[in-house]
Amino acid sequence: MGSYLNPGCKGFEESLNSAIYVDKTGLIEKVNAVVDTRQKYICVSRPRRFGKSMATDMLAAYYDQSVDTARLFDTLQIAKAETYQKYRNQYDVLKVNMQEFLSMTHSMDEMLAVFQKRMIADLKRGYPDYVMDGEDSLVFAMKDVYAHTKCPFIILI
């Protein structure tokens, strides 16, 4: 859909099509176990080059409601999980690479302002009838979208 909102499955598809792919969809089952609980805020930290981007591409493809990704996941480990169908393609996904914002700004305040502006613009493109013109609060924009769609957000940073 957008740059950040519901990014689809292209990134994960590229990983699947690579000469070397290791199925890490077991991570999805771990996330599914907490997605509807108070423990839903998860931090997966790893050193550089440990596959964080591939993991976020995979999670975005799995949860993104704007595209049916059954064809990508049906043959992978996650398809055997009890929760596979329940959560697949059921959320609005915001996927963000914070390094993108850090590299284009000179201060934390500027970075946060640019980040918020870009996220709101993407929400407005995706849901023009639900995000008010001139909205400058990301939290309110997301609440407005949720109030109309009842589709929860998964945020991947």
Model-found features: residue ranges?
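Phosphate-binding site recognition
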Residues: 1-157
